[in-house]
Amino acid sequence: MEIKEKTMEDQKVAIMNYKGALKDMDVLVSKLTGWIEVEEIETAGDLFAIFYNNPRTAKENEVVYDVGIPINPELDPDETEEIRIVTLIEHKVLSGIHNGSLDNIQESYNIMAEYSIENKYDIIGSPKEIYLKNKYEVDNEEDLVTEIQLPVIKMG
């Protein structure tokens, strides 16, 4: 797995906050993409999720996460009860690509965590998964491509 440091520029996103089961993400994605289509909002990137606790260890209905998608920064769409418009501010991340099923994505997280320690990075925020090729676009789970981003600062 190739891991590299990247600087993420400010990014305007449409985002939904959620606490519940990870399997509910499909419903959230449907609501978000439906809203984008109805409101004719120009997107500027791929669907993503930010996890505030570990979905693999949290109780089933207590996973805390956001689902979002970058939008054209010049747009100023109206928010809904569930969908907010926010700007993610510029920050540094360690980025790695996970290929294949999300069932074994924890292995990629472990590799990235080891890399961060070995290279003196401090992970300072919640991980973000960007679904470059998501399950709505591919027929086989092995064709999934997910970018993992860990917000970091370089130590020493």
Model-predicted regions and their roles:
Residues 1-156:
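A solvent-exposed interaction/effector surface
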